[in-house]
């Protein structure tokens, strides 16, 4: 609550809001995609699990300094501008990857749930982030979808900022600068690996060529907000469970509900969750009950995802990528070791650097080299947890060494280059709607003048095909047993080119 010295924030209340944020899409999914008996049973499990998790959360309060009272808007404004820049709310021409989302929203708003296309394919995708806004657009009006999606995303970003403040209350600004603007980390990684930062031939703009930045991990985290939010919340809950014993039930419930947001994120977090459960679990009936509920949610979502997993398109993998896959596997035991040492709070800077440098090296190599959607999602929770520890170490080390403080500030400034460039790029594309954007992949070659500002009102261009990552044949337990039955339908006019 506000006071002359600042204000306090309750981790218990923040964890509850996070759990409700992750859980709301499940209520919509159960009510609209599943047969009534299964919807009722799973809905009761969801409500019971959330109630037990909330009830067992420790009462922990974090005191914020008084400067938070008047600098909060300064802190959140760049993040909100970045969200608008990538396409959230459709204020600007969206980032090219974000156009995939518009096909997904278009189908969710216009077609009956669960979605089956005329060729027999089903829409199989982690739809947790998309469901609240799509449901609002379906029930009310398509334009409402855009408005709800914007504020739904802004609320998620606000929770992220509050969690960062609760984790680093005295140094929130620098923490967010390192954590959220991690483009500086990737710039260093590309320099170490000898990879290019710019491609001068990819994007012709108004008068000549404006370079496009090859920052793959930034793109993936920025333009896939559902995946990023689920990974951040899950990593944060695990971090506070290990440090503060916040609530293991909250962690388990958050893990079970993250499947609908991104099943790859949930699967990648499983080794870390097992490690935290093994070291912090107590014999309570509520823990067993919440654990069973989270496993049920995970099994149902994996039944939903299984047809897509079986039919993922494959591509040849180089030896370099195989080596990076192995590095990502090594990232997990390194992270477990870091988690195991968190409680020691060793502040001798060179000892902390010995532990941080190998982890940061793995982070750089895996983040830069693994330009693969699924692998990035699998490593998202370890990525955020490693970043938590790196931020904590840097903020404690820089107090004792001036040169380390200078290096930290340079890293933050480098990180700001990346989102600033992307925001400039999207504003530029919005100012010149006649421009064409080309890419070797035909999925991204389209005339921007043919796309309306509010994409959901009209169809996307016919050459913007649906991603194969959204489609799967209607087979397996989910479509045959759990999902609602829909009558066969003809192709809708809105789906025609």
Regions from the language model: what does each represent?
Residues 1-69:
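Membrane-embedded, hydrophobic transmembrane alpha-helices
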């Amino acid at each position: 609550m506000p006071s002359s010295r600042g204000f306090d924030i309750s981790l218990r209340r923040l964890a509850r809001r996070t759990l409700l944020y992750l859980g709301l899409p499940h209520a919509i999914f159960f009510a609209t995609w599943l047969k009534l008996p299964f919807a009722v049973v799973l809905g009761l499990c969801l409500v019971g699990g959330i109630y037990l998790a909330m009830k067992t959360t420790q009462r922990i309060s974090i005191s914020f300094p008084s400067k938070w009272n008047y600098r909060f808007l300064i802190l959140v404004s760049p993040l909100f501008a970045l969200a608008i820049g990538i396409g959230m709310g459709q204020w600007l021409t969206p980032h090219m990857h974000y156009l995939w989302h518009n096909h997904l929203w278009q189908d969710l708003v216009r077609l009956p749930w669960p979605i089956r296309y005329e060729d027999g394919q089903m829409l199989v995708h982690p739809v947790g982030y998309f469901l609240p806004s799509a449901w609002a657009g379906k029930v009310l009006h398509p334009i409402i979808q855009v408005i709800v999606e914007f504020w739904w995303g802004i609320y998620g970003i606000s929770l992220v900022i509050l969690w960062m403040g609760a984790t680093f209350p005295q140094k929130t600004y620098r923490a967010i600068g390192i954590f959220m603007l991690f483009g500086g980390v990737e710039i260093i990684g590309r320099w170490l690996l000898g990879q290019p930062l710019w491609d001068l031939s990819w994007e012709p703009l108004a008068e000549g060529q404006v370079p496009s930045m090859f920052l793959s991990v930034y793109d993936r985290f920025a333009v896939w907000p559902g995946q990023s939010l689920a990974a951040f919340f899950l990593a944060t809950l695990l971090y506070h469970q290990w440090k503060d014993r916040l609530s293991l039930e909250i962690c388990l419930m958050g893990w079970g509900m993250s499947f609908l947001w991104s099943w790859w994120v949930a699967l990648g977090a499983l080794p870390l969750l097992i490690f935290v459960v093994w070291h912090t679990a107590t014999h309570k009936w509520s823990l067993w009950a919440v654990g069973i509920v989270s496993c049920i949610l995970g099994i149902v979502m994996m039944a939903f995802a299984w047809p897509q997993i079986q039919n993922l398109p494959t591509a040849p993998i180089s030896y370099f990528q195989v080596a990076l896959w192995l590095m990502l596997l090594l990232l997990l035991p390194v992270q477990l070791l870091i988690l195991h040492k968190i409680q020691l709070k060793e502040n001798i800077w060179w000892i902390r650097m010995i532990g941080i440098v190998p982890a940061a090296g793995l982070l750089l190599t895996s983040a830069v080299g693994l330009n693969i959607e699924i692998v990035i999602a699998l490593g998202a929770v370890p990525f955020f947890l490693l970043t938590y520890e790196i931020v904590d170490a840097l903020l404690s080390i820089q107090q004792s060494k001036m040169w380390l403080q200078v290096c930290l500030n340079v890293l933050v400034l480098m990180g700001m280059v990346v989102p600033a460039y992307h925001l400039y790029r999207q504003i530029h594309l919005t100012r010149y709607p006649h421009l064409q954007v080309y890419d070797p992949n035909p999925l991204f070659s389209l005339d921007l003048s043919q796309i309306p500002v509010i994409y959901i009102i009209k169809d996307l261009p016919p050459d913007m095909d649906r991603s194969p990552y959204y489609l799967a044949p209607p087979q397996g337990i989910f479509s045959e047993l759990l999902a609602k039955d829909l009558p066969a339908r003809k192709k809708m006019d809105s789906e025609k080119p």
